[in-house]
Structures are given as structure tokens and as C-alpha cells.
Regions:
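N-terminal cap/lid segment of alpha/beta-hydrolase-fold proteins
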Residues: 1-9
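Active-site loop/oxyanion-hole signature of alpha/beta-hydrolase fold enzymes
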Residues: 5, 48, 54-98, 102, ...
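Conserved HGGG/HGGXW glycine-rich cap/lid loop of the alpha/beta-hydrolase fold
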Residues: 13-63
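Short beta-to-alpha linker loops that shape the active-site pocket of alpha/beta-hydrolase fold enzymes
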Residues: 42, 57-60, 67, 127, ...
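Flexible "cap/lid" loop of the alpha/beta hydrolase fold
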Residues: 108, 112, 119-153
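Alpha/beta-hydrolase
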Residues: 156-232
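Conserved loop-alpha-helix segment in the C-terminal half of the alpha/beta-hydrolase fold
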Residues: 218-259
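Catalytic histidine-centered segment of alpha/beta-hydrolase-like enzymes
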Residues: 256-268, 272
Length: 285
């Protein structure tokens, strides 16, 4: 657990260590209602490629502390910056920071506000999300994107659903998805992120406008969007990525097609190889 000075202790999971690594360290940030372990497949590949890796449970998620407030983009980004400052003293200096979906928006905000802490950022099917373009009114967004009530679902049923919905995912992806839930003594699940906090995170994402800060970002940004029927806002995604290509000063795009929104869980080896290549070809220099 790391408290980076914001008063909330965040759980970290590590693979490899800086002393034995050859290449840039990596810090991995999950999406809304997800958790650090959904990165496990990619983290194992990163470590095998010579990177020291840390994945973080953001506030309210996984095994991190769960305050009742502080789920706006600024506060969550401050949490991550505080963790990076602690990690820097432990040998993880200026990592490449990857974030998925909501986490993609978080790392873009991080690159804007704290460029001195990162070598660059990777936005995985995120970093371009501007929910107000799709839902001008918050109430409309809150209804449309309200999560399903999974409380009380048997563990076995949930795992069976995951395996059926994602037949091409490796075991690390299924296990990581199951880690979104606390497993109760009666054999049922409870999401680590409560509905109330979920909606607070969603409100913070709805308020965030990453395109307004693109031109001011001074570190490299890699966008890794997913293309497919299950992608987020597939109809406007290419337009959003084109906007990023024309606005972010140092930018690269690596499309995964076809791919799920959680492409890092679905294709962990390929994802790790794409990011690793950018750490050795000079993009993240």
C-alpha cells in the first residue's frame, strides 16, 4: 500500500524490480470499476521483456482504501502522481504510465499536469473519452451508463459468464476480471467499487475534456484504441483519434482491430510488445 500524500493508501502489485530491469519501468492504471490484476497478463510479458512493472488499484477500487469523496479527475490524478513520487524513490524513476479507458483519461491528465514524473503515457482505448459529446446532460449519462447490479451473483455464475463472453481471453484476463469483485462467504460476489462511488467516478469522467489539454502536453502520448463491435463509442472513435493526432505534439497510434475494450486483457502479449517497442525505438525518449 502506498499513500502518496493525498491521505488515501493505494494497493500496488509488482512484477520484477528496478535493479534487475534493462528498460524503462512501467506503471499501469486500470479503468472504471476494474482493478490492478486485469493487467497481469501484460505485466508478466513486460517483466519478461526486461521492465519493472507496478499496477495500481485506484481509490475505491480493488484492495485500495475507499473514501466517500475524491473521485473527480483532478483528485484521482493527484493520487497517481503521489504514488509515482514514492515509486521514484524506490528506483521506478520516470516510468511510462499506461491507463485503460477512464485510466486512459487519467494518464493524459497526468501527462498534462505532472510531465516531470513520466517518460510518456499510453492511453488504452481511452484518453479521448469526452462523455458530454454523447450525453450533454449528466442525468442522461448517469442513466445510460449506470452499471448492472451484480451484488449477490454466485461466483461460479459470474465466472461462467466471463468465460462465455470472452472465449478468446487468456486465463489472466478472466482471473483479473473476477478480481473486480469481493468473494463473500456465501459464495456470491460484491463489486469492490460501490454504486455510489461508481457514479462519482463517472461524473468526474463526464466532466473531463482531454481534447482541451492535448496541445499543452509535452511528453509522448501513445494511443492504443480498440476497433470492434464491443468498443466504446466506435462510431466516433476514429474522429477522436484523428483529433489527437493533429493536436498532441508527440503522438503515436497503434490500433487493435478487432479487439475488445479491455484489449490489454484480451491481447496481453501483443500489447506489451507494442509498448516495449516504443520504449526502445526512441518514441519514449
Amino acid at each position: 500500500m502506498i499513500d502518496g500524500g493525498t491521505g488515501v493508501a493505494l494497493r500496488t502489485v509488482r512484477w520484477g524490480n528496478p535493479e534487475d530491469s534493462t528498460f524503462a519501468p512501467l506503471v499501469l492504471i486500470h479503468g472504471l470499476a476494474s482493478n490492478a490484476m486485469l493487467w497481469e497478463g501484460a505485466a508478466l510479458e513486460f517483466a519478461a521483456l526486461g521492465h519493472a512493472v507496478v499496477a495500481v488499484d485506484l481509490r475505491g477500487h480493488g484492495l485500495s482504501e475507499k473514501p466517500d469523496t475524491g473521485y473527480d479527475m483532478q483528485t484521482v490524478t493527484n493520487d497517481v502522481a503521489g504514488v509515482l513520487q514514492v515509486l521514484a524513490a524506490q528506483g521506478y524513476e520516470r516510468p511510462v504510465v499506461a491507463g485503460q479507458s477512464w485510466g486512459g483519461n487519467v494518464v493524459v491528465e497526468l501527462a498534462h499536469l505532472f510531465p516531470e514524473l513520466v517518460r510518456g503515457v499510453v492511453a488504452v482505448d481511452g484518453g479521448f473519452l469526452e462523455l458530454q459529446e454523447h450525453f450533454p446532460q449528466w442525468d442522461e449519462c448517469a442513466v445510460a451508463l449506470r452499471p448492472p447490479n451484480l451484488l449477490g451473483t454466485p461466483v461460479s455464475r459470474m465466472r461462467g459468464y466471463m468465460e462465455g463472453a470472452h472465449p478468446d481471453w487468456p486465463k489472466t484476463g478472466i482471473d483479473g476480471s473476477m478480481a473486480n469483485f469481493e468473494q463473500l462467504p456465501d459464495g456470491t460476489i460484491r463489486p469492490w467499487l460501490t454504486l455510489e462511488r461508481h457514479l462519482m467516478v463517472l461524473r468526474g469522467l463526464w466532466e473531463h475534456k482531454p481534447t482541451h489539454i492535448y496541445k499543452d502536453i509535452t511528453v509522448p502520448v501513445m494511443f492504443v484504441p480498440a476497433e470492434g463491435p464491443s468498443g466504446v463509442f466506435s462510431d466516433t472513435k476514429r474522429q477522436a483519434i484523428e483529433r489527437a493526432l493533429h493536436s498532441v505534439p508527440k503522438v503515436r497510434v497503434e490500433w487493435f482491430s478487432p479487439a475488445d475494450h479491455d484489449l490489454h486483457a484480451q491481447h496481453p502479449v501483443r500489447f506489451a510488445q507494442v509498448v516495449h517497442a516504443a520504449t526502445i525505438d526512441g518514441f519514449f525518449s
